[in-house]
Amino acid sequence: MKAFTKITAIVAPLDRSNVDTDAIIPKQFLKSIKRSGFGPNAFDEWRYLDHGEPGMDNSKRPLNPDFSLNQPRYQGAQILLTRKNFGCGSSREHAPWALDDYGFRAVIAPSFADIFFNNCYKNGLLPIVLTEEQVDRLFKEVEANEGYQLSIDLAEQTLTTPSGETFTFDITEHRKHCLLNGLDEIGLTLQHADEIHAFEEKRRQSQPWLFNG
């Protein structure tokens, strides 16, 4: 998992509430359990004018010019700004995979669906909760200023605007540790590999009958 420390990046606005996981990555693209390759189909039904299916050459599909993420000014964005209850709907870890593969490192919203929120942390994507008033202000600034960038410092738990205004956000120490060090659940377990092996050896000596056969 990629570590997250600090970024300064373009912000792309998605001015919709209750964006569900089927909108983030439609169900027909869930046939793979690899974490990569989902980016071209993120927001597929809004992003393209035709209906997408696995195996299609996305470079030849007609883009929807009215979809915000297709606008040239937001190309290369690594921060997604959106509205409340983002990531609602069915549980699918493919949703944060698709956002990550698209190029997003962080998502800012007033609220997130619980399962999606947890899945973000497991996959190196930082979900930031701000108040609706703060999100409204950011939307206005993003839309008024082409190339608008925000700076996110995870260690300090701050988000800074181009004018120098700073917002703070909450995150548990455990989640911060994992993101700062690029540790998913497997990586976190492997940090304790020596202790695990020592425990297994001690148990093998004290209860050898469990290891016969």
Curated annotation (Swiss-Prot):
Pathway: Amino-acid biosynthesis; L-leucine biosynthesis; L-leucine from 3-methyl-2-oxobutanoate: step 2/4. The keyword Amino-acid biosynthesis applies. One of its GO terms (biological process) is L-leucine biosynthetic process. It comes from the Bacteria. Catalyzes the isomerization between 2-isopropylmalate and 3-isopropylmalate, via the formation of 2-isopropylmaleate. Heterodimer of LeuC and LeuD. NCBIfam families: leuD, PRK01641.1. PANTHER family: 3-ISOPROPYLMALATE DEHYDRATASE SMALL SUBUNIT (PTHR43345:SF5), 3-ISOPROPYLMALATE DEHYDRATASE SMALL SUBUNIT 2-RELATED-RELATED (PTHR43345). This is 3-isopropylmalate dehydratase small subunit.
